[in-house]
Amino acid sequence: MSETVIRTDDGTFAMINVFEVEPDRQKELADVMSEGADRFIRHRQGCISVNILTSLDGKRLVYYAQWRSKADIKATMGDPNVQYYRDKAAELAKPDPHAYTVFSVHHPEN
């Protein structure tokens, strides 16, 4: 099983989508994003992990997916099943998606 590990030297890419959502729709958005990730995204070539974070004030949802390559992200975004969930999410909230690489990671000293 893959898990989320954030490193600067592994060549992975992150697709981070920050949604602005009305607090009474945050749970619905989280359910939609979780269903899409479970049914389609996690099975796509190059997917390492998908994490869905909800803000405590109910106004944001962060969708954090790690990928092996930019090509894997692009291929996934072209999948009609993925597009369905992307469109459904956009009906519920304002998305702001971008691809990222890790610049630095910091851990506390033990």
For each feature predicted by the language model, list its residue ranges.
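Glycine-rich beta-strand-turn "strand-cap" elements at beta-sheet edges
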Residues: 1-13, 20, 51-61, 85-110
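Short amphipathic alpha-helical segments, especially helix-boundary/capping motifs
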Residues: 11-15, 26, 46-47, 61-63
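Short, well-ordered amphipathic alpha-helices
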Residues: 34-38
